[in-house]
Structures are given as structure tokens and as C-alpha cells.
Amino acid sequence: MKTLKKQGGFTLVEIAIVLVIVGLLLAGVLKGQELIENSKIKNIAKDMDAVSASILSYRDRYRSLPADETGSTIVLYGWAANVGGGNNNGLIGAASVDPFGVVAGENVNAFRALRYAGFIGGNPADAAAAARPAHAAGGNMALGNTLWGLSGNVVCLNNLTGKFAGALDRLIDDGVNNTGIVRSATVAPAAAAAPAAGAYLEATTGYFLCKQL
């Protein structure tokens, strides 16, 4: 007479315990991702503030905005002459021009001047697009003026998701994309007028954001 063998397997209680553990692990991963994203957003905001503070400190020391000086003035500091060439008008670059589309002149040389002066890190020899500092979301920072309804000089970011752009706007300003000191859109900042009103679509990529200095 054959003896029936007891088949091994998981009980419902064991399966339930495993599912609970998996759920807790997933929740931990998601929470970790959220913390990382929040950290990046805060770091980007701090970097924008740091650029603003650096420009003010530069102006206090040199009585001019970075790269707004003439080349003959720049060489008196012992820096490369091509870091200068500005027009001393108190503005960085040409008005209402996409700062990410400019690879020469005050827009990019301002960062080189800040590096020569020791206000920000990086190699002052880096020129053109390479002069723009990177930000924590994988894009770059740029400087311009009179953009998106913001008068005077502005610092801008590219390559943001709607989630990051919206979070930055709410952290720094009013959370509305076309009002306040922060403006944002999925088109490059290349106009004096404010961008069209629109919601921050969190899953959408390619946002630009500018903050008045």
C-alpha cells in the first residue's frame, strides 16, 4: 500500500507575509525616489540663489557685472581678454534672446568671469556652451535679460520635467507658470513677453524655467 507524500508549498499566511514585505520594500523604494527628487529640487533652487549671490558679490568687488566689462578692463585682472568685450550697460547679454542658443559673448562669458573671480567652481577656460554650469536635473543654467516678462537679468534652466519645474516655481514663487519672479514653459525663453498660461504637466519633459535676479 502506497503512502501519500505531503506536498510542500506556501500557506496563505506565508504568501500574505511575503506580499506585505514586498509592499513595504516597494514603498521604501518609492519614498527613497521621492526624497532624492526633493533633494535635487532644493539643490537646484540653492544653485540659482548661489548664482544670484555670486553676481552681486562680483558687482561689489569689480563695480561691474561679470563679462559686462570691456576686454581692456578684464586683462587688468590677469584674465583672458575674450572674457570681456561687454558694453557696461548693466545687463548680461542681448535682450530677449534665448540664452541657451548663444555660444559667445556676455551670456556665457559671465560664468567664466565668475570662475576667474573664484565665486563659482569650474574651469574658467571652458567656453561657449561648455561654460554653462550643470544643474542637478541633468540640464544647464544660463544667463540672459528681459525674458518672459521679467525685467533685468535672469538665470534660466533647461531640460526640466514638468514635475521639477512646477516644484521649483512653488518653492521659489507662486506656482503659476507665467506670473511672479519665476516663469516657465516648454518653449525656449526667447521673447520679452510672458509665456502662455499653462499647467505644469509632471510627466512632460523639455521645460525651461527662468528666475529674475
Task: Describe each model-derived feature in a short phrase.
Residues 1-10:
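N-terminal leader/signal peptides at the extreme start of proteins
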Residues 7, 21, 61:
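Short glycine/serine/threonine-biased micro-segments
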Residues 12-13, 33:
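Alpha-helical membrane-interface segments at transmembrane helix boundaries
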Residues 15, 19, 42-45, 108:
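Conserved structured core elements
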Residues 16-30:
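Alpha-helical hydrophobic helix detector
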Residues 29-50:
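Aliphatic-rich helix starts adjacent to a transmembrane/signal segment
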Residues 49, 53-73, 120-121:
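Alpha-helix exit/C-cap motif
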Residues 68-213:
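Low-complexity, acidic interaction segments enriched in glycine
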